[in-house]
Design a protein with these regions (language model features):
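Histidine/lysine/aspartate-rich catalytic loop segments that bind and position anionic ligands
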Residues: 110, 141-194, 198
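Conserved N-terminal beta1-alpha1 strand-loop-helix module at the mouth
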Residues: 1-69, 73-75, 79-86, 96-98, ...
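Catalytic cores of alpha/beta
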Residues: 76-94, 149-159, 204, 208-222
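Alpha-helix-loop-beta-strand connector modules within alpha/beta enzyme cores
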Residues: 49-74, 121-143, 180-204, 210, ...
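Active-site beta-loop-alpha junctions enriched in small/polar residues
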Residues: 7-13, 45-47, 70-76, 108-110, ...
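Glycine-rich, proline-tolerant flexible connector loops at the mouths of alpha/beta enzymes
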Residues: 38-63, 107-120, 168-179, 235
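C-terminal helical cap(s) of enzyme catalytic domains, especially alpha/beta-barrels
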Residues: 117, 176-181, 234-254
Length: 254
């Protein structure tokens, strides 16, 4: 079975557009779980423009399913200018205090709108390996955000990480435009084969939707997808519970 982890960032972004607690993040997490989601994902950025530090603690206190926190493990503390928002403690400090089921490590910068590339482990491999070991010593499963590059995936295995998450934007774009789709899809098939051969668990995410997900879900070895933006958009017209159920069907598990 391929697990569906629902990313709540866009729901938090709606909340933060007003000075309010609506939509309530834990309540919407529970709605997703009740509808069949296998896990919950958040990506608290240093500016806390969507998910906030307090959301992470609120979710950790109530979740009985997999809790996946994404972020750059090299990002340190950040002060906030708002009196009603806690300072960002740094990714590793947050992970150590919460101890989620899984940490997905992502090499994003403060100024990025969204995650847009995987790790370059030729450059950062030694540092990433130390951070992976630090998280694993706390009982946290680790996953590295990676491009579908066999050489980089082999380097990921050398860090000792439990899993990788394939960055799927190039597949989603090729599916949308039709440009070189078969070639791009086979890149992901090959990347998955290398990951499995290296003993890595395989996750995937970014711009997966109800149209492109069924084909991607045929890739052997895929264990989990993390989906937020498109699921939230579909929830506007379908309702959240029906959207979660639709994504489970697209994975072949609903």
């Amino acid at each position: 079975m391929i697990a569906l982890s629902v990313n709540l960032n866009k729901i938090a972004l709606i909340r933060n557009s007003r000075d309010t607690t609506n939509p309530n993040i834990p309540q919407h997490a529970q709605m997703c779980i009740d509808a069949g989601a296998n896990g919950i994902t958040v990506h608290p950025r240093p500016d806390q423009r969507h998910i906030r530090v307090t959301d992470c603690f609120d979710l950790a206190s109530m979740l009985q399913v997999e809790f996946n926190i994404e972020g750059n493990p090299m990002t340190g503390p950040r002060k906030t200018e708002r009196s009603d928002v806690e300072d960002y403690p740094g990714f590793m400090a947050l992970a150590k205090e919460i101890r989620p089921t899984q940490c997905t490590l992502v090499p994003d910068g403060d100024g990025q709108l969204t995650s847009d590339h995987g790790f370059d482990l030729k450059q950062d491999g030694e540092q990433v390996a130390r951070l992976v070991q630090e998280l694993q010593s706390l009982g946290i499963r680790t996953s590295l955000f990676m491009d579908p590059d066999p050489e980089q995936i082999r380097l990921a295995a050398q860090t000792g990480t439990d899993r990788i998450e394939l960055y799927t934007e190039t597949y989603a774009r090729a599916f949308r435009t039709g440009d070189d789709l078969e070639h791009v899809f086979q890149q992901f098939v090959r990347a998955a084969e290398v990951a499995v051969d290296e003993g890595l668990g395989l996750n995937a995410g970014h711009d997966l939707d109800l149209n492109n997900l069924p084909r991607f879900a045929t890739i052997a070895g895929l264990r989990e997808v993390s989906i937020g933006h498109h699921l939230t958009v579909d929830a506007i017209r379908m309702g959240l519970a029906d959207a979660v159920a639709a994504y489970q069907r697209a994975l072949g598990t609903g």
